[in-house]
Amino acid sequence: MTTQASTFAVAVPSVATPFRRHRNPFVVRAQAEPSDKSVEIMRKFSEQYARKSGTYFCVDKGVTSVVIKGLADHKDTLGAPLCPCRHYDDKAAEVAQGFWNCPCVPMRERKECHCMLFLTPDNDFAGNEQTITLDEIKESTANM
């Protein structure tokens, strides 16, 4: 026997039903990955911008990989590479405003990248590379 919870519109087991372990029904998991084309576009953009700005990727290429995939996902879903490291109440409005589209205004004006994608040489987390391969991105993010 189940009752309908009107607030959330989900079935709730009655008290008589024994407790069963199931995944949390309120957890939403993303199913889609960004397209390989968008990941490649954002990879190339990131390499070019690092060279142009005199910045470097994080010594942990996993950080670089996750950010590039986040940018690619936003490029696919929003049409622009909105910074994936921030919370937005309205992503579409943020894309239209352009402030947080990569490279964001703080990066362009002061070389401050919140995502740690573009790091100045004096940053403790900066590596010495301005390149990353598509295979490195796939390998770093395979189990995520």
Curated annotation (Swiss-Prot):
It comes from the Eukaryota. Residues 1-31 form a transit peptide. [4Fe-4S] cluster binds at residues 83, 102, 104, 113. Binds 1 [4Fe-4S] cluster. Its cofactor is [4Fe-4S] cluster. Its main location: plastid. Keywords: 4Fe-4S, Chloroplast, Disulfide bond, Iron, Iron-sulfur, Metal-binding, Oxidoreductase, Plastid, Redox-active center, Transit peptide. Disulfide bonds join 85-115. It is found in: Plastid, Chloroplast. GO terms for molecular function: 4 iron, 4 sulfur cluster binding; electron transfer activity; ferredoxin-thioredoxin reductase activity; metal ion binding; oxidoreductase activity, acting on iron-sulfur proteins as donors. InterPro entries: FTR_bsu (IPR004209), FTR_bsu_sf (IPR036644). It catalyses: [thioredoxin]-disulfide + 2 reduced [2Fe-2S]-[ferredoxin] + 2 H(+) = [thioredoxin]-dithiol + 2 oxidized [2Fe-2S]-[ferredoxin]. Its EC number is 1.8.7.2. The record marks 114 as: Increases the nucleophilicity of the active site Cys. GO terms for cellular component: chloroplast. It holds the Pfam family FeThRed_B. Signal peptide: none annotated. Belongs to the ferredoxin thioredoxin reductase beta subunit family. Heterodimer of subunit A (variable subunit) and subunit B (catalytic subunit). Heterodimeric FTR forms a complex with ferredoxin and thioredoxin. Catalytic subunit of the ferredoxin-thioredoxin reductase (FTR), which catalyzes the two-electron reduction of thioredoxins by the electrons provided by reduced ferredoxin. This is Ferredoxin-thioredoxin reductase catalytic chain, chloroplastic. It comes from Glycine max. The gene is FTRC.
